[in-house]
């Protein structure tokens, strides 16, 4: 079993964006009957390499080409959205996908993105809590009082109770937010005490703790599978390094997030012991999956051209099938 992640980075020297978007949709359609458990789409704005800014739109295209594949949007920076408009898009996407799209909401962390939308970053926590309080009722079609006006979103979503919502973050504030609102919690860090804080906040507000996920020490977050690992690093290395450098630039001075690498060369990235970027042999991929873990594939990482990406994806899927055999 494996997951697919798409950030849609397209640096100038990589594949054309239109080809990458088409390939992402094709890959999801192809992979859903071959062991794909989940497609993960991220959201960032104003990035020099075109990082995906509209995950709900891409999710809609993927949902239209698939029938069973779950799609997680992680993380959506909720203070950058208008809650009424977001609820409308979530409701329609829930209808299109028949409930297969889930959301991990965060408060955002790049000052440039708040400036991009003219939003005050210093109020992001308060704004997020205000929006989370009304978003659920809105997608369920209830009348909501929001900032002095009565609002009702139509059509209501198809999923009873609304789409699955998680809170993404790695801080005590994120754990409290998830518990207060009764949502699941996806932590990007392994900060001690977060799990206990989340569970206590849930129960203090009348909720049973929901889905919870923490990073596993030494586990990769981006994987390719290749028969010839040396050749694969030669081909894929510049793309993986670009992804690593860009992701690290989003979090200057913050090394607490499991997916962040500070490598400044392909050699350094490859040499990281237990680092987030790995290229497995098929046998290593089989062993990883048989250890009870999902293989986190990132087929178009750093703008890998589709004709280059497909053979690596097929190799990974073949290994996943063998692991299940």
Regions from the language model: what does each represent?
Residues 18-30, 89, 169-176, 281-289:
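Short, acidic/polar
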Residues 2-6, 39-41, 71-74, 101-105, ...:
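Hydrophobic faces of well-ordered beta-strands that scaffold small-molecule active sites
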Residues 4, 33, 122-155, 194-294, ...:
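An alpha-helical appendage that flanks or caps ligand/catalytic pockets
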Residues 1-66, 70:
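N-terminal beta1-alpha1-beta2 module of alpha/beta enzyme domains
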Residues 12, 46-50, 78-81, 252, ...:
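Short, small-residue-enriched loops and turns at beta-alpha junctions
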Residues 296-324:
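Generic C-terminus detector
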Residues 8-21, 76-84, 161-169, 223, ...:
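Active-site mouth loops of central-metabolism enzymes
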Residues 82-181, 186-201, 205-213:
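Internal, glycine-rich beta/alpha segment that forms the wall or movable "lid"
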């Amino acid at each position: 079993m494996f997951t697919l992640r798409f950030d849609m980075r397209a640096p100038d020297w990589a594949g054309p964006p239109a080809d990458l978007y088409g390939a992402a949709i094709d890959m999801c359609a192809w992979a859903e009957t071959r062991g794909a458990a989940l497609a993960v789409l991220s959201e960032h704005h104003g990035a020099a390499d075109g990082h995906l800014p509209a995950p709900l739109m891409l999710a809609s295209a993927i949902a239209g080409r698939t029938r069973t594949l779950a799609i997680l949007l992680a993380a959506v920076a909720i203070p950058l959205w208008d809650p009424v408009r977001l609820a409308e898009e979530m409701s329609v996407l829930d209808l299109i996908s028949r409930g297969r799209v889930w959301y991990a909401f965060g408060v955002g962390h790049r000052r440039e993105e708040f400036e991009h939308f003219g939003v005050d970053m210093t109020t992001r926590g308060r704004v997020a809590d205000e929006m989370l309080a009304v978003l659920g009722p809105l997608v369920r079609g209830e009348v909501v009082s929001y900032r002095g006006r009565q609002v009702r979103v139509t059509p209501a979503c198809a999923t009873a109770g609304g789409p699955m919502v998680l809170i993404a973050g790695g801080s005590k504030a994120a754990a409290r937010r998830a518990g207060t609102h009764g949502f699941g919690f996806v932590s990007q860090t392994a900060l001690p005490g977060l799990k206990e804080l989340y569970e206590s906040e849930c129960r203090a507000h009348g909720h049973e703790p929901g889905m919870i996920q923490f990073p596993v020490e030494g586990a990769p977050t981006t994987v390719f599978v290749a028969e010839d690992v040396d050749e694969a690093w030669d081909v894929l290395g510049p793309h993986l390094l670009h992804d690593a450098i860009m992701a690290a630039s989003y979090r200057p001075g913050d090394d607490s997030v499991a997916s962040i690498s500070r490598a400044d060369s392909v050699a350094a990235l490859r040499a990281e012991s237990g680092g987030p970027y790995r290229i497995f042999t098929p046998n290593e991929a089989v062993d990883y999956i048989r250890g009870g873990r999902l293989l986190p594939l990132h087929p178009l990482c750093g703008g890998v051209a589709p004709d280059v990406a497909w053979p690596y994806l097929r190799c990974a899927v073949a290994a996943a099938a063998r692991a299940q055999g």
